[in-house]
From Swiss-Prot:
Organism: Bothrops alternatus
Family: Belongs to the venom metalloproteinase (M12B) family. P-III subfamily. P-IIIb sub-subfamily.
Binding site for Ca(2+) 2: D70, P71, E73, D85, V86
Gene3D superfamilies documented for this protein: Disintegrin domain
InterPro entries, per the entry: ADAM_Cys-rich, Disintegrin_dom, Disintegrin_dom_sf
PROSITE patterns with a match to the protein in the record: DISINTEGRIN_2
Taxonomic path: Eukaryota, Metazoa, Chordata, Craniata, Vertebrata
Name of the protein this chain belongs to: Zinc metalloproteinase-disintegrin-like alternagin
GO molecular function: metal ion binding; metallopeptidase activity; toxin activity
Domain Disintegrin, first and last residues per copy: 4-90
Regulation: Inhibited by EDTA.
Summary of subunit composition and partner proteins: Monomer.
Length: 196
């Protein structure tokens, strides 16, 4: 059962141009609370590209860039809504060729992924640590297939479990790994990482 639209419930429903609540409570200068239609001369009532009841000027940024792979979006000047969030194509080089774009991010090995798991003084381990990913067991693998660990090919050893070097005085662990019983993928190299 679909209930009919109700003007004044602060929900934008079919047939309404705006809905700012009851006439007593409406705080939107662009909207006629009694009819849920825009007032005369108003182009819009709300949204990221609506300012003082008019569409925001074309080219005005409405969504900031979150990374090199996620460009900022801008108002079109023809709509109250911000343009759809788009990313650079997956596989496009980023961060001076250290990584590839993947779903709007630029995941790289180096310090960032180890830091996120373990904190300061932890860096990407030596290449020799990653060779364990060829074993295809609980400690080293590339991916899971039917709950079984599948080994990495020699060329892909840096695409599986993430090995970090802990330089802190108490640890001094050259091949540190992260284990999680809640998330079996946590502790793996992030998807999309340039793992050469």
């Amino acid at each position: 059962i679909i209930s009919p639209p109700v003007c004044g419930n602060e929900l934008l429903e079919v047939g309404e141009e705006c809905d700012c609540g009851t006439p007593e409570n409406c705080q939107n200068x662009c909207c006629d609370a009694a009819t849920c239609k825009l007032k005369s001369g108003s182009q819009c009532g709300h949204x990221d590209c609506c300012e003082q009841c008019k569409f925001t000027k074309s080219g005005t940024e409405c969504r900031a860039s979150m990374s090199e792979c996620d460009p900022a979006e801008h108002c079109t000047g023809q709509s109250x809504x911000c343009x759809x969030d788009v990313f650079h194509k997956n596989g496009q080089p980023c961060l001076d060729n250290y990584g590839y774009c993947y779903n709007g991010n630029c995941p790289i090995m180096y310090h960032a992924q180890c830091y996120a798991l373990f904190g300061a003084d932890v860096y990407e381990a030596e290449d020799s640590c990653f060779k364990d990913n060829q074993k295809g067991n609980y400690y080293g693998y590339c991916r899971k297939e039917n709950x079984x660990x599948x080994x990495c090919x020699x060329x892909d050893v840096k695409c599986g479990r993430l090995y970090c070097k802990d330089n802190s005085p108490k640890q001094n662990n050259p091949c540190k790994m992260f284990y999680s019983n809640d998330d079996e993928h946590k502790g793996n190299v992030l998807p999309g990482t340039k793992c050469e």
